[in-house]
Design a protein with these regions (language model features):
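RNase H-like nuclease fold core
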Residues: 2-51, 62-63
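Short, conserved alpha-helix that lines the donor NDP-sugar binding/gating region
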Residues: 53, 57
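RNase H catalytic domain
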Residues: 14, 18, 58-147
Length: 150
C-alpha cells in the first residue's frame, strides 16, 4: 500500500459546561505526519464532552470524503488519534456503550466507516493532541468554522 493511501487524523471535541456549547477540531496528516488540512466547527447542539468527541470523528469522516472524494476514500486507511481513551475503546469495540445518545453517535460513525478501506482508533496522550484541542478552543472562542490548507 502506498503512503498516499494511509492517513492519520487527530480529532478532539470539547464542551464548555459539560453539557454546554461544543466544538470539534480535526487535523489531517499523511502517514509521515505532515499536515494536509485542518478543520474546526462549532456544534449546533449543546453536547457533553464525550458526545463532542464522537461528533469530531463524524465531522472528520465527512471532511475526508469531501477532501479525497468517495472513490479514493474506498482505498484509504485511516488511523484516528484522540485523547479520549473511552471513545477510542468504544469505537474499537472494546467497551460497551450504555447511553442511548452515545449509541446513536456510534451508529453514525459505523455507517460512515463503510466509505473507507480501513479505520482504527488510537488513544494518545493529551500532549500529542494539542493542535486538535487548539482548534476546538478557537471555534469556541468565536474564531471557528475554518478550513486551513497547509
Amino acid at each position: 500500500m502506498s503512503k498516499d493511501n494511509k492517513i492519520i487524523v487527530y480529532t478532539d471535541g470539547g464542551s464548555r459546561g459539560n453539557p454546554g456549547p461544543s466544538a470539534v477540531g480535526a487535523v489531517v496528516c499523511d502517514e509521515s505526519g505532515r499536515k494536509i488540512k485542518e478543520y474546526n466547527q462549532v456544534l449546533e447542539d449543546i453536547s457533553t464532552n464525550n458526545e463532542a468527541e464522537y461528533e469530531a470523528v463524524i465531522f472528520a469522516l465527512k471532511k475526508l470524503r469531501q477532501l479525497f472524494g468517495k472513490e479514493k476514500t474506498q482505498s484509504l486507511e485511516v488511523q484516528f488519534r484522540m485523547d479520549s481513551q473511552l471513545i477510542a475503546s468504544q469505537l474499537n469495540g472494546e467497551y460497551r456503550i450504555l447511553e442511548e445518545r452515545m449509541q446513536l453517535l456510534f451508529v453514525k460513525v459505523w455507517n460512515l466507516k463503510f466509505d473507507f478501506k480501513k479505520i482504527n482508533f488510537k488513544s494518545i496522550p493529551r500532549e500529542q493532541n494539542k493542535r486538535a484541542d487548539e482548534l476546538v478552543n478557537q471555534a469556541l472562542d468565536g474564531q471557528g468554522e475554518s478550513e486551513k490548507l497547509l
